[in-house]
Amino acid sequence: MPEPTTDTPGIPEEEVAACVGAWWREGGRGDQVAFLALADDHDASAVVRDTHAHVPGSVVVDATGLTADQTMQQALTALGVDLSEDKREDWRFALGAWPEERLLLVVNAHRAGPTRRSHEPERLVTRTLRHLARGKLAVMIHVVPRLLPTRADPKTVFRVSAPATEPTVAPDSAALRALALAEPRLVPLPVWAQLVTALTGEAASEDELTEFAREEPGILRLGPLGVSFVDEGLAETLRRETESADLLRVHGHLVTWLMRSAPDMRHPEGWARRGAVGLYAATGLAMHAVQAGTYGEVLRDGRVIANLPQTALMDAARSITFRIPGNTAASDAIHLWGWGVTPRHQTEWASWLHLMALSRDDLEVASVIASSGVALPWQAKWAHWRPPGGYHARFLQPGKFAALTEVRWQGRPTIAGLQQRTVNGEQQLYVSIWDVETGDHVAGPWEYDEIPQEHRADLTWTASSGNGSAAPARVRELFAASSPRRDNRAFVLPCAPLAVGDVVVFAGDLGLIAIKPADGVDIADFGARLRPLSGDYTDAGPCRPIDAPAPSHEDLITLFGEDLLYPIEVEDFPDRLTHAATRELLLDFGLPYMNEGAMGLFPFGNWEIGILDELPSWPEGIDPVPESGPFFQIGKWMGGKLVIDGPTGHVLRVPTEPGQDHLAGLPVAHSLEAFLTMVALFVTGWRSRDSAPPASSEREQISYWVLGALAEVDETGGDQPAWSYVLHNT
């Protein structure tokens, strides 16, 4: 058979099926991706249908309007793969277990996604379908030239020559040109009228547009929910011919009109359930806003985002950039997607958006979401946790929870949490007490089995506990009847949920939150994880409290607690450490006692070193540094000594031997204050990464968030390889 390349003419349409059939019969095509490349306006349905007939056992999926995840779901279902909840993770094994190879044909990949500007076509072609081609399954994708990967093997590209047929003749009509600028492909008549008004500056009659559609049945299809093009290729051609100024004006007008119409689209289940216009707005508003340059404003409007699907928020953001800024509903959507939180109903998705806004203290947006008209099935009462995508010391303050039980503290309903933390490399259990109504931390941590004598009168059992005594005497009694922890892989917060009054408390390694369900709503499965078949969507920036000050050395108090920060005693302070700001910080604030992330800081020394041991000069054989010393050791890092230069206050890492350029850290920071700020950022990232799902993209993203944050504090020190070496190799 011919082997088409970029230098060879296209294959005549009538010969494509035979060429693909011959290619397939050669065998050994499993886990390959091939491409059927046709011109943008070329209808591929006949070509794919004929190809399907030439390859026995092949399956065809039309990607038009589908997300990459929906396309993958349809494909696997058509191939007979079991996608039931307990089997869906095994789809990769299923593809490799077939006795013979099979071919999946995906048509209209360039029309994937619910909107015309969607990023889904690129995602489908460059990522999703490549991951699907494995084992005994090969995938052939119908693409247009702009989507054909530049590194595609020419032997797997079947370029189809355009047929010698007359193109569709369409009337020169402003109404037709305006309709092509819609984002969803099915357009309600009121929306079409607004598109015409935006393009021409003149009012348009819905009756006249209806009559126009009826007069052009070969071009337009009229149905109960609106009008669409018979040949989507014509719409794509008209869009390409539109001036950029016209595009900006039309999209801006439509965003304004849809936002103004929001009160009329209110519905307990979201805009999409309020007629054709509501469905159009829910599907297309975000992408119109992208092209109007107002997507940032949309993301700050809780009334709007409560009605926009998770995929619409992600798709619109990704169509702008591959690096999605953090602290927005779009980044929330991406982080939750990566954790496997993909609610099926808009109402539940709005509840998650409310929780994420509340988690970063964006109370204004949370309040507007709650009053958006969407009937939230549950609302977060308070949240003390590291939300998916969270990167801030404050998010880590509540700690990790292993079990919960209900108690009373001074008569008030409270939660006792069995918690765990790592101290000097060892797991340590402790107990804390939390107020159910306010979420306040009211007592603890208690690190030993005995409940402190001074608190025994404050802590009592509930009246319904069934315990023989009025109050527990030991910590172990608190959790004797606790329900077992659920599967870590199946739930975001795997501790058994605990109902207290009108709220249900959930906890786990991420922290603790209280959820108030609506009447009659069962939220036992809150936080259930169902990882999307198509995998991670894209990278997004971190989530932080909106009122958080700039990073500071004082963040170490949040991370370690004041009891693990040790100022240096005056009598222990070396005279030759003369840098004034460094002396003041060490005497007043001190250093944390830590051994974490291959770094140890020892404010009172350890078995190897004393307090601020002096290193009189830089070791011989090690590349010299501008600092003259003497140097004073505060700890160790990746085997090397961490020292402070006495005259300048610079913090340096002393390599253990020559030739350690990949671990050089000179200087680590230009001041002790900057170094301690960087330590806080590093430890925050280290602990946050530990709480992310194994093998998740968030674990890798956190490493880059940390490196970026370090460079903002000290550009030179943050760029030193030892930071990244630890993050990427441990």
Task: Report the location of each language-model feature.
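Sensor-1/coupling segment of RecA-like P-loop NTPase cores
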Residues: 41, 123-154
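Conserved P-loop NTPase "ATPase switch" module shared by AAA+ and STAND
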Residues: 94-122
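A eukaryote-biased feature capturing mid-to-C-terminal, repeat/solenoid-rich segments of large proteins
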Residues: 169-174, 226-228, 235-278, 292-312, ...
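C-terminal boundary/linker of central alpha/beta nucleotide-binding cores
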Residues: 172-240
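Long, low-complexity, intrinsically disordered segments enriched in glycines and aromatic residues
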Residues: 473, 591-716
